[in-house]
Amino acid sequence: MSISMDNTEKTPLYFAKAAVETMMRRFRAQDLPPKGHFHYHQGVFLSGVYQTYRLCGDRRYFAYIKDWVDSCVNEGGEIHECDPGALDDIQPGILLYPLLDETGDERYKRALDTLLAAIQDFPRNEAGGFWHKVDCPEQMWLDGLYM
């Protein structure tokens, strides 16, 4: 995709695709920072890539998401470089749902089951909100509301 200064209407989808294309040119999926870590930095970005894919149907976007997840989740469904005691490392699990739906690959179900068990046992504050991390007692961070 080339970004030009023509008179084409610049819709939100136009800008979403421009952002996705830029990141895809800059980083191979498995190299998205922090490289080799199942983390919310990639999870939030790739959630946006998935929404862009849903709107425009460009299968390259779905393949990019799958490539990143497959670099973190092995054939047995084990997630490497994931701390289940941190919401930051649970957030990318949202990507596993569409991968399971579209591919039927059971590794994504096994990875989801692992994350579900972690979140069910995750510590909560008095109001029921999740602690940001197991080692941050009673701390509920704003981004944790999203995660």
Place the predicted regions along the sequence by residue.
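Mature N-terminal, pre-catalytic/accessory segment of carbohydrate-active enzymes
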Residues: 1-12
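N-terminal basic, low-complexity leaders that serve as flexible interaction/assembly modules and, when applicable
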Residues: 2-4, 22-25, 31, 37-44
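A short, Lys/Arg-enriched amphipathic alpha-helix followed by its capping loop at the start of a domain
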Residues: 12, 51-58
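Long, well-ordered core segments of solenoidal/helical folds
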Residues: 12-31, 60-80, 110-129
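Short, hydrophobic transmembrane alpha-helix segments
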Residues: 31-34, 54-56
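Well-ordered alpha-helical segments within folded domains of soluble proteins
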Residues: 38-54, 84-101, 140-147
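A contiguous, low-structure linker/loop signature
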Residues: 85-125
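Flexible, surface-exposed loop/gating regions in the mature catalytic domains
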Residues: 126-145
